[in-house]
Amino acid sequence: PVLRGFEANRVLIVVDGVRMNNAIYRSGHLQNVITLDPNVQNRVEVLYGAGSVMYGSDALGGVMHFQTKNAEFAQNGKFQASGGAFTRFSGANSEKSLHANVNLGWAKWASLTSVTASDFGDLRAGRRGNPFQSFEWQRNVYAARLNNRDTALVNARPEVQIGSAYRQLDLLQKVAYRPNAYTTHTLNLQYSTSSDVPRYDRLSETGANGRPSFAEWYYGPPKRLFANYSWQ
């Protein structure tokens, strides 16, 4: 994300009150925010401008505070269970996603479990464009490994951005204990992993001969393990 012209290690990402930025965050483009499952977010606060006084270092351009859903207790003291699930298919990137969540609530205990698995294919742009503009966005050639050699192949469908596909898995588990009406203990566990995330802007570069400059250029695979205990 870019806030007020700043990005990467100049924009602070906070998850459930815990800063996500660390010492290895570089100043170039970052994809760490994709490790946050949008299906478990309760609210997202975006603060534009410097916020280092309140949130600490790295908040030069702004702050993005992600707050995930909480485990819900039974309202009437009796056991309550709720949940939801969905599947999603998308033609623009051949997306196949599956999400399921279950909430179990008692008078003093509560549990929230969430699982999201996604398989994103290569992005596909529209075939028709402005004839008065260039078509540099088209993927006319791509690199592949054939017979143990890097080979440039012609893309039969230039609107398909070959090399932009990846897979992702997101898990969340929250356990809450409320001994009385004034105190709540919460254990928050989150895990996210994915396949290699292609850096498409590099893979789409071509040399003077029209061939791809790079056969492979990946981010990751990024893995995020989050564990937090809170007492309210």
Language-model features, listed with the residues they occupy:
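Extracytoplasmic beta-strand/coil segments of soluble accessory domains associated
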Residues: 1-19, 42
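N-terminal periplasmic accessory domains that precede
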Residues: 1-2, 13-14, 30-34, 46, ...
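Outer-envelope beta-barrel architecture signal
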Residues: 11, 77-83, 96-98, 107-111, ...
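Short acidic/polar hinge/loop motifs at secondary-structure boundaries
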Residues: 20-50
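Outer-membrane beta-barrel proteins
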Residues: 22, 96, 120-126, 184, ...
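Transmembrane beta-barrel strands of outer-membrane/channel proteins
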Residues: 85-91, 104, 113-119, 187-191
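Surface-exposed beta-strand-turn/loop segments characteristic
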Residues: 112-167
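Flexible loop and strand-edge segments within Gram-negative outer membrane beta-barrel domains
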Residues: 162-170, 176-232
